[in-house]
């Protein structure tokens, strides 16, 4: 069962959302920061090294993004309650512009201003305004006994 957007706000799952962000089945998340990837990352069996990022400078709050991959951070603070899991999807307008947003699963107990990968596949690029709603967070109940809460490296990120 998925929680309604209204319930996500009432339960404090999403804080700092913009006007119009509450949807029937979730809450829209907006762009807070955008970085281009400055070097390669490493993902091994035990270790990981995140690529450095260069903050994108936006003229008058509008970013001119060339085709490629970008890392972005959302404005909103998300707190996934125990017994629930969060999923983030691109808004359909973004897809129709030739762009994709990739998000990871947000486990029970995660709190932070999450990050996502924005892939601009449109050969003409994308003009993206800071603060624009770019993703929708949906939250579902996890069935069965809960054995632990999220304690990973990204707990409290961006706060």
UniProtKB/Swiss-Prot annotation:
Pfam families: DCD. InterPro entries: dCTP_deaminase, dUTPase-like_sf, dUTPase_archaeal, dUTPase_trimeric. It catalyses: dUTP + H2O = dUMP + diphosphate + H(+). Gene3D superfamilies: 2.70.40.10. GO terms for biological process: dUMP biosynthetic process; dUTP biosynthetic process. Pathway: Pyrimidine metabolism; dUMP biosynthesis; dUMP from dCTP (dUTP route): step 2/2. GO terms for molecular function: dCTP deaminase activity; dUTP diphosphatase activity. It comes from the Archaea. This enzyme is involved in nucleotide metabolism: it produces dUMP, the immediate precursor of thymidine nucleotides and it decreases the intracellular concentration of dUTP so that uracil cannot be incorporated into DNA. Belongs to the dCTP deaminase family. Archaeal dUTPase subfamily. This is Probable deoxyuridine 5'-triphosphate nucleotidohydrolase. It comes from Aeropyrum pernix (strain ATCC 700893 / DSM 11879 / JCM 9820 / NBRC 100138 / K1). The lineage of its organism: Archaea, Thermoproteota, Thermoprotei, Desulfurococcales, Desulfurococcaceae.
